[in-house]
Amino acid sequence: MMTLNSYLSIVTLNVNGLNDPIKRRRVSDWIKKQDPSICCLQETHFRQKDTYSLKIKGWRTIYHSNGPQKKAGVAILISDKLKFTPKTVVRDEEGHYIILKGSIQQEDLTILNIYAPNVGAAKYINQLLTKVKKYLDNNTLILGDFNLALSILDRSSKHNISKETRALNDTLDQMDFTDIYRTLHPNSTEYTFFSSCLLYTSPSPRD
């Protein structure tokens, strides 16, 4: 069994809908190829009754947060290799975020997986962090599709970031959160957006 003292890999992917069986199979194959300890998905577009359709060998433990319609939706998948003990799950009724608190070999871990709305993303995340602050601790990972760029290095166009995004950055700083990617790659201009399904080409903000 893997522990936090071992190498812990986490991947995140906006799947833009998983109701199509071919799409689910492609996502399943991608996850198996990446072989992460934890996988966070955004825009699953599941309703509660649809979640049974996501089955991936090796990742039997899946936590969903779904809205009432086929939009938004987030999920956290835990590898069978990980001895994970859940403690608390907080789900957004609109399917825009999920908080999972648990432990791996008695070491606490909190994951906040976010799919922010296309409009007003920075303000939404800022308000969300205040709303769920009591669940966050010094072993918290915040990830997902923020629908914004936190830095001008995170976007292909070099326009200045908005005042709402600057306010969000201030909140993250005040809460002592660190942008792991930007810390490890301070000057990188890589992007993680892909244009459609799982074969994508167009660069866009690193969300």
Predicted regions and their residues:
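Flexible loop residues that form catalytic
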Residues: T44, H185, R206
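Short, conserved micro-motifs composed of acidic
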Residues: K55, H185-L199
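Short phosphate/oxyanion-binding micro-motifs
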Residues: M1-I142, L150, R155-F177
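Conserved small/polar residues in nucleotide/adenosyl-binding loops
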Residues: Y200-D207
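His/Asp/Glu-enriched short active-site or ligand-binding loop at hydrolase and phosphoryl-transfer sites
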Residues: F177-H185
